[in-house]
């Protein structure tokens, strides 16, 4: 079992899973808070997506209610629009460990409704209601290693040090008593003990006392090579429902505001497994399943203004307040351990947990957007956006999260892990003939992680293109968006040792995501 230095501690905390033995958010740290705070470029409408999302200074599109609400006052007519889409994700997971490197890739395809909008325009004033999908969590990944020397059971042994064996058994009259006695952080270890992955060390609890130390050597002989695998399936979205209003001052100054109400859900199913080639004694294989279900609602405010100093130029600015979120979660797990030879007449051991429920509040960072666009005669538009997001201001606002928010002597807090990001978006629209529009866009976001050694993780790039047909009654737009990012590496399992520093495996998983979005928008004017 490896003890890490402070740099590796930062990696383990920031790199995602933190501990497969403790998947509740209170045990994980700040990675889920980042997940619900980072939208990248969203999905939105086909017109805005085709232009790379560079829409801070533009308007008269359903996406403006979630970008710069001043754009709603640019509508010259009332409109109803919907944007269904198809999202294809490809997730690559490279496993690097003592046995070498292995690459694996899985894909996922899912249809969706990216946005919906209704706008009523009356002269200089417009109001609207809409829905924009800000984030999509649907995906699958698999990471496979080989020749590892450490087992997740070794982490569990360290995790349960000092806990009497009599407290973590499963008596027939109350099989879940151990789980109600200890927090979910220890549930993985309890599952391992009850399924027979490791044994108590006799005599470690004092005279006539139950053992308080454990060992895997009865199941995993020294020198045994392990073949770990982590399969992950995620689903969920962040949808934002918007109520917007805007006013147009003589086509020179446009102002607007949006009340955003977010609907959030996220599900994650993990199966971590280990297998050996041993046939005569001990462990044959283990399977550790975990389910995390999260749902919540949040509220925020957006305000914006756009000025048109000359007919061909627009300059826009918008501020997005933090989103205040109330989140609920459920977590449960199960473990099955298969033996090479029957133990007490059984070929395998099994244990599962009850459902752990928790509720807490969180705050996402604020955002500042600025954009400039120019009309090129009657044939085109060029638009450029800049966005700043202060991820160091993310925070859990409920009790019990002080160590995550502020850090400890062994683990860094949110302000040490995260910093501000800079995002640029650029888009062009060209009208070669009447009613036909061609579009292209690009976007780039810097990493939210602090430290030069981490900056290559979390960067996001996006390329897009689109085509549109528009007349006085209907708009039909189609866009294709391709995005790619390298996520923070993480350990397949990790926990804090008795000295306060993480104890973990040799293996590290390096995820890379690619996604393809096809968006069709149809809007009717009246």
What do the predicted segments below correspond to?
Residues 17, 58, 76-79, 252, ...:
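Short secondary-structure junctions and interdomain/linker hinges
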Residues 52:
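Residue-level detector of conserved, well-ordered beta-strand and adjacent loop positions
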Residues 1-31, 526:
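Bacterial Sec-dependent N-terminal signal peptides
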Residues 28-42, 48-49, 121-526:
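Outer-membrane beta-barrel porins/channels
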Residues 3, 94-105, 494-507:
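Low-complexity, polar-biased intrinsically disordered regions enriched in Pro/Ser/Thr/Gly
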Residues 46, 58-67, 72-150, 239:
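Outer-membrane beta-barrel translocator/receptor signature
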């Amino acid at each position: 079992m490896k003890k890490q230095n402070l740099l590796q501690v930062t990696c383990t905390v920031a790199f995602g899973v933190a501990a497969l033995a403790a998947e509740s958010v209170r045990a994980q740290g700040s990675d889920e808070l980042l997940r619900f705070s980072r939208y990248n470029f969203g999905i939105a409408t086909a017109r805005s997506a085709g232009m790379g999302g560079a829409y801070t200074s533009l308007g008269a599109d359903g996406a403006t209610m979630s970008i710069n609400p001043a754009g709603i006052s640019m509508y010259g007519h009332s409109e109803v629009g919907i944007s269904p889409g198809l999202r294809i994700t490809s997730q690559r997971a490279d496993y690097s460990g003592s046995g070498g490197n292995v690459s694996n890739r899985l894909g996922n395809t899912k249809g969706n409704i990216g946005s919906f909008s209704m706008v009523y325009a009356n002269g200089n004033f417009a109001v609207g209601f809409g829905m924009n999908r800000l984030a999509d969590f649907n995906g699958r990944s698999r990471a496979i290693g080989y020749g590892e020397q450490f087992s997740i059971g070794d982490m569990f042994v360290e995790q349960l040090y000092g806990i009497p064996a009599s407290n973590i058994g499963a008596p027939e009259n109350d099989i879940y008593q151990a789980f109600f006695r200890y927090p979910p952080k220890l549930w993985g270890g309890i599952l391992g003990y009850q399924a027979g992955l490791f044994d108590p060390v006799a005599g470690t609890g004092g005279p006539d006392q139950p053992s308080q130390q454990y060992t895997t050597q009865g199941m995993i002989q020294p020198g045994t090579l392990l073949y770990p695998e982590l399969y992950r399936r995620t689903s969920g979205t962040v949808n934002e429902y918007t109520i917007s209003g805007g006013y147009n001052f003589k086509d020179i100054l446009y102002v607007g505001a949006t009340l955003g109400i977010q609907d959030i859900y996220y599900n994650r199913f993990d199966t971590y497994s280990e297998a050996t080639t041993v046939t005569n004694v001990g462990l044959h294989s283990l399977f550790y399943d975990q389910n995390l279900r999260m749902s919540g609602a949040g509220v925020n405010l957006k305000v914006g203004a756009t000025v048109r100093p000359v007919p061909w130029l627009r300059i826009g600015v918008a501020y997005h307040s933090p989103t205040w979120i109330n989140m609920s979660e459920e977590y449960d797990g199960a473990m099955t351990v298969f033996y090479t030879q029957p133990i007490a007449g059984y070929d395998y051991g099994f244990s599962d947990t009850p459902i752990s429920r928790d509720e807490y509040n969180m705050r996402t960072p604020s955002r500042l957007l600025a954009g400039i666009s120019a009309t090129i005669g009657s044939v085109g538009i060029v638009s450029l956006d800049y966005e700043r997001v202060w991820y160091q201001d993310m925070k859990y606002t409920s009790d019990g999260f002080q160590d995550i928010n502020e850090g400890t002597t062994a683990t860094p807090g949110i302000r040490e892990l995260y910093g501000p990001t800079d995002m640029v978006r650029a888009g062009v629209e060209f009208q070669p003939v009447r009613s036909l529009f061609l579009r292209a866009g690009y976007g780039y976001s810097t990493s939210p992680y602090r430290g030069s050694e981490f900056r290559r993780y979390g960067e996001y790039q996006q390329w897009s293109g689109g085509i549109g047909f528009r007349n006085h009654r209907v708009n039909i737009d189609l866009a294709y968006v391709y995005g790619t990012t390298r996520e923070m590496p993480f350990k397949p399992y990790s926990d804090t040792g008795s000295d306060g520093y993480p104890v973990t495996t040799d293996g590290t998983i390096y995820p890379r995501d690619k996604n393809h979005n096809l968006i069709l928008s149809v809007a009717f004017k009246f």
